[in-house]
């Protein structure tokens, strides 16, 4: 543990979970829960997606009547699971997004246009909405799709910041070209990008970001978040990785042997949530692989940062002594304008 404050917060999270979660009550050995050190913490077993799926309700730490929101994971890597949020958890979520927005230069009085869903138990849309309120800014909740409606709102309401899946920004650009709209003569100054990477492994712009910037001169911010952690890693204006909010998440980035990777190296993101009431998670294996950067950012912040998600650990392809993640293959096809649809299959060559 880096310092006494972090150690106490992590220890408090563990005590709370063991005292209130049926899952953690049996998951941890009491012999490991005394004096918490860096070494004893690393001896605690991981929490996996399978644990959360198979014992979902046993993670709940409060009576059902204290649950204010039920949110679910996307299910992209398995069966969707439910996370239970109390009013305090919603306040934590709002604080996280407010501070994430501030990293991008957003401020009170700005106007956001939300181009993602806020229904269907989707946490991200809810988090963005709460964060905007906490920032004392304004929000236009359009939701996903419908380029005509999005542009009508942009031209009429003049938002400063868009929250969108970056590939949808390409759709907006195409619509604007077809309808005589000059994208660079609008009020929009930036877009907070969700769900898709806009950075290469070296933190430079990837093909998608370059395609957007070829037509639209707005600042793009990369984010990484998950429903389970209830927090986000967001770029500052230096665009050198998403900053950790160390008051909400304790971060580990580990190699295949469970050892912390050095600065600039890649590993699996492991999180322990801090300050959660409904569904705290301890040493949760996200399955996502990214590089970690620990040097002081040029913005002056000293918090660790993570690069773009290179892929999911369970989707890693080993080919002729090299490790490949599917997103690196996607980018090759995405860079070819003549390719509109593709499918990738991985098989062993037995011939």
Where are these regions (language model features)?
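Active-site glycine/GP-rich loop and adjacent strand/helix microenvironment
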Residues: 1-16, 135-351
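AMP-binding/adenylate-forming
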Residues: 87-102, 111-171
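A generic alpha-helix surface/boundary motif
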Residues: 22, 94-95, 126, 206-207, ...
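Nucleotide 5′-phosphate-binding alpha/beta core
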Residues: 1-72, 78-95, 99-103, 257
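Residues that mark the start of a beta-strand
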Residues: 109-111, 189
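Generic structural marker for isolated residues within well-ordered, non-membrane alpha-helices
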Residues: 70, 97, 129, 209, ...
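Gly-rich Lys/Arg/Thr-decorated short loops/hinges at beta-loop-alpha junctions or inter-strand turns
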Residues: 77-82, 108, 134
């Amino acid at each position: 543990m880096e310092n006494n404050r972090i150690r106490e917060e992590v220890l408090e999270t563990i005590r709370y979970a063991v005292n209130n979660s049926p899952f953690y009550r049996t998951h941890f050995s009491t012999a490991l829960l005394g004096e918490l050190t860096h070494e004893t913490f690393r001896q605690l077993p991981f929490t996996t997606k399978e644990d959360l799926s198979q014992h979902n309700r046993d993670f709940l730490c409060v009576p059902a009547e204290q649950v204010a929101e039920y949110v679910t994971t996307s299910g992209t890597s398995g069966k969707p699971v439910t996370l239970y949020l109390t009013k305090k958890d919603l306040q934590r979520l709002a604080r996280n997004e407010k501070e994430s927005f501030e990293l991008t230069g957003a401020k009170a009085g700005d106007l956001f246009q939300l181009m993602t869903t806020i229904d269907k138990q989707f946490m991200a849309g809810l988090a963005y909405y709460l964060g905007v309120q906490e920032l004392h800014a304004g929000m236009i909740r359009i939701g996903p799709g419908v380029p005509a409606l999005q542009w009508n709102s942009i031209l009429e309401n003049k938002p400063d910041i868009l929250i969108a899946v970056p590939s949808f920004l390409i759709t907006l650009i195409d619509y604007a070209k077809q309808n005589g709209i000059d994208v660079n003569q609008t009020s929009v100054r930036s877009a907070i990008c969700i769900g898709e990477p806009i950075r290469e492994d070296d933190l430079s712009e990837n093909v998608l970001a370059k395609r957007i910037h070829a037509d639209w001169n707005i600042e793009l911010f990369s984010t990484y978040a998950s429903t389970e952690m209830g927090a986000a890693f967001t770029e500052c204006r230096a665009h050198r990785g998403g900053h950790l909010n160390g008051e909400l998440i304790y971060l580990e980035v580990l190699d295949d042997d469970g050892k912390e990777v050095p600065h600039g190296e890649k590993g699996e993101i492991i999180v322990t949530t801090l300050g959660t009431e409904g569904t705290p998670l301890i040493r949760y294996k996200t399955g996502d692989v990214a590089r970690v950067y620990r040097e002081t950012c040029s913005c002056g912040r000293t918090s660790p940062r993570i690069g773009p998600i290179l892929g999911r650990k369970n989707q890693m392809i080993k080919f002729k002594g090299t490790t490949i993640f599917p997103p690196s293959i996607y980018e090759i096809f995405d860079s070819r304008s003549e390719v509109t649809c593709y499918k990738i299959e991985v098989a062993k060559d037995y011939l």
